[in-house]
């Protein structure tokens, strides 16, 4: 049985993202992410951070105060903690967008770290979902109201790429990080199936601009 957790990072989210939180999920708020917990009416099970982007909250929730000088971001620390405690299905909210692009890139790296360690990981905001494609694990995605399906290599080369159920199918293809071959594909079936044999990929589902 999967152990589910939600990481709340600092980018403000809308209440629409409540749909990604299930009863019983372990909720970790990272630094200013505790404000997202308040927006979503969630009670964090754990708060972590160095509190450089928001004051440390006065709360009875378990809190781990991190040093300002450290290698891990607050979100990366939360990812380490959850992995060490056996969580294998993790959703990151408040991790995309915001004023600092480098934080989004750092959170994508954190997601990759989790995926490479066997976690089923999802990053989501109001317009998109991001999933990781790793060797040996077929990714089956539901069409729902998604318009675009894009695939990007995360580690230089993505090999043995197969995409089915999309307008631009691929079979045993090689993708490289310096050529965006996989951008703006579209569903042609109720589900799309993606596989790879080497490297790691990032799959982005996006709703229509209209």
Predicted features by range, described:
Residues 113-129:
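Short, acidic/small-residue loops that bind anionic groups at enzyme active sites
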Residues 1-57:
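N-terminal beta-strand-loop-alpha-helix module at the start
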Residues 62-68, 118-122, 147-152, 157-158:
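A glycine-rich helix N-cap at a beta->alpha junction
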Residues 8, 28-31, 49, 64-65, ...:
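General beta-strand structural signal in soluble alpha/beta enzymes
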Residues 128, 133-210:
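Long, charged alpha-helical interface segments
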Residues 101-112:
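Short Gly/Thr/Asp-enriched flexible loops that form oxyanion-binding sites at enzyme active sites
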Residues 63-85:
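Short phosphate-binding loop-to-helix
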């Amino acid at each position: 049985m999967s152990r589910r957790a939600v990481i709340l990072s600092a980018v403000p989210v809308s209440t629409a993202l409540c749909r990604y939180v299930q009863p019983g999920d372990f909720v970790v708020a990272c630094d200013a992410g505790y404000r997202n917990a308040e927006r979503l009416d969630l009670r964090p099970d754990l708060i972590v951070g160095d509190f450089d982007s928001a004051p440390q909250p006065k709360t009875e929730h378990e809190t781990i105060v991190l040093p300002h000088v450290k290698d891990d971001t607050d979100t990366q620390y939360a990812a380490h903690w959850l992995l060490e405690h056996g969580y294998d299905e993790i959703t990151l909210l408040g991790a995309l967008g915001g004023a600092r692009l480098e934080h989004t890139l750092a959170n994508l790296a954190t997601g990759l770290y989790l995926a490479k360690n066997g976690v089923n990981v999802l990053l989501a905001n109001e317009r998109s979902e991001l999933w990781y494609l790793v060797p040996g694990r077929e990714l089956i995605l539901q069409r729902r109201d998604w318009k675009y399906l894009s695939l990007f290599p995360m580690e230089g080369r993505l090999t043995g790429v197969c995409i089915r159920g999309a307008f631009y199918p691929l079979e045993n293809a090689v993708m490289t990080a310096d050529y965006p071959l996989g951008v703006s594909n579209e569903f042609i079936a109720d589900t799309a199936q993606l596989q790879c044999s080497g490297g790691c990929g990032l799959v982005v589902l996006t709703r229509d601009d209209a």
